[in-house]
Each structure stands twice: as C-alpha cells, then as structure tokens.
C-alpha cells in the first residue's frame, strides 16, 4: 500500500506543480523531432548530371535500335567531327535537364524500308528506360526528327568515303 500512496503523492505533487509525466514525454518527443528535421535540412544530399552525360546515354540508347543508321548533328557537330574520329555519341542529341526530369531531342538517319513510327516507339521506350535507370531522371519528352533516309549500303558507302577523307586529311596535316 505504501507504493500506491507514494505514487498518489507523487501524482498529486506533479499536478500541483504543473508537471505531468506524459506531457513532459510528449514535449521531449517533439523537441527530438524538431532537431532531426533541422539536421536533415542542414545535410541535404544532391545528385546531379550534366547535359552531356544525359546526351551520351540517350545517344547510345538510340543507336541500339534497329533501323537507326546514324544520328545527324548540326553545323557545330559536323565541324567537330571533321577534326575528330567522328565517333561522338552525342551527335544529333540535345537535352534539357532539370533536377528530376529531362527532355530529349534526337535527329536521326533512318534505314530505308523501316517503319519510322515503330522505330520512334522503340527509341522512346529505350531512351526513357536507360536515362531513368542510370540517372534516376524521369524523361518527360522525347522528340525525334528524321533528317534523312538511306539504304544500309548507301550509308556504308558514305561512311567509307568519309573515313577515307578523314584519313587523308590526317596524313596531310601530320596528325595520327
């Protein structure tokens, strides 16, 4: 009985002085939650990707789709490729990258006889999948512009001609 009397006396004292055990525990819990929130706000982690990284991912993914012979760049890409090996995977790809989303534009050369709508669906699916998997970014838009249509043979002949021209230019300038 003395334990009950002791608890009653303690409870009466706490009530008189305004100290309530449950209230005190609740206040401590709220203070701890507040501290945790402040710590989380102070140490905010961030993962970002440059536009060039997303361009590379999209360019590699698009080239994997059957029916895409090549990607076609603008003047700057053509100028850059004239002085390089021509294996720039970002050629024909431009992107806008936000914190959580990306929009991708592609300029392609299609193989004659292939269905552009089917290729577009496959490219869209693969590009979205790869960008999401590698970066975590949601691709909200994929636009594909068909700049040329060639037979595979025609495309190979054009590439052989370009490779021969690049090799001749390298030899003339002393580059290897």
Curated annotation (Swiss-Prot):
The organism's place on the tree of life at top rank: Bacteria
Low complexity composition bias: residue spans: 1-16
Compositional bias segments (type: Basic and acidic residues): 20-38
Region (Disordered): 1-43, 154-176
Matching Pfam families: Asp23 (PF03780)
InterPro entries: Asp23 (IPR005531)
The family this protein is said to belong to: Belongs to the asp23 family.
Function: May play a key role in alkaline pH tolerance.
Protein name (database record): Alkaline shock protein 23
């Amino acid at each position: 009985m003395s334990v009950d009397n002791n608890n009653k006396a303690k409870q009466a004292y706490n009530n008189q002085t305004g100290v309530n055990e449950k209230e005190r525990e609740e206040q401590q819990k709220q203070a701890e939650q507040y501290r945790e929130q402040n710590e989380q706000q102070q140490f905010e982690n961030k993962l970002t990707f440059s536009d060039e990284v997303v361009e590379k991912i999209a360019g590699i993914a698009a080239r994997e789709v059957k029916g895409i012979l090549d990607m076609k760049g603008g003047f700057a890409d053509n100028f850059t490729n004239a002085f390089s090996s021509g294996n720039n995977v970002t050629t024909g790809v431009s992107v806008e990258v936000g914190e959580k989303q990306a929009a991708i534009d592609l300029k392609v050369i299609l193989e004659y006889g292939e269905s552009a709508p089917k290729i577009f669906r496959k490219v869209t699916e693969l590009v979205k999948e790869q960008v999401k998997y590698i970066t975590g970014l949601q691709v909200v838009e994929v636009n594909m512009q068909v700049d040329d249509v060639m037979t595979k043979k025609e495309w190979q002949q054009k590439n052989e001609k370009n490779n021969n021209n690049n090799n001749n230019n390298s030899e003339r300038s002393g580059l290897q």
